[in-house]
Amino acid sequence: MQFREGTVFDLRSDVFKLVSAMKRLIFAALVTAALPLAACSKDFDNSTVKEFDLSRYLGEWYEVARYNHSFECGMDNTMAQYILQDDGKVVVLNTGWKDGKFKLAEGKAKYPDPADDPGHLRVSFFLFFYSDYNVMMVDENYQISLVGSKAEKYLWILSRTPVPDPDLLDMVLDEAAKRGYDTSKLIWVDQSRNIEALESAD
């Protein structure tokens, strides 16, 4: 077999290119493999309160502020009611004003681990699809609460009154910020219809 002049150098060059390409592929594979691990590390804290009394949490809560999301888009005067049934299950009634009328969504809540994780509930509004309901803060008198979920894109501030006490509101906003949530993204909910209804009832 005869080699033309420069063939050996061409082969060496090809081998070098092949090795370089393999190194790039290996590096890319390692980076890709590391992405899920990076995604799992979160920069927000959605841990639940360690002391929580469900019986004191029951009743009506007004939605003061929330992150924007599809299932409440364009809705105001929103509120939630939590009702304990005789069988121990919790019924969830969510109401809100949209398209010129109040709309009602009825759901249910489970209490998976009241002993070790008392501030964690699971709420469903459709069949057997449940979402995490994390009570991340509630004041000692159960007048205001900060609620999150598994993902950072969900955040709610709930109050027993349509207009919360300013000091309590500042407290819950500080807590949200400490946990890594961007409070500038909060949508402040118009509660004028609920306020009017309360005033009319007095």
Residue ranges and their predicted role:
Residues 8-21:
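Short, Lys/Arg-enriched N-terminal segments with co-localized hydrophobic residues
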Residues 40-202:
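A beta-rich soluble binding module of mature secreted/lumenal proteins
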Residues 23-26, 43-44:
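Hydrophobic alpha-helical segments with strong N-terminal bias
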Residues 25-34:
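Sec-dependent N-terminal signal peptides
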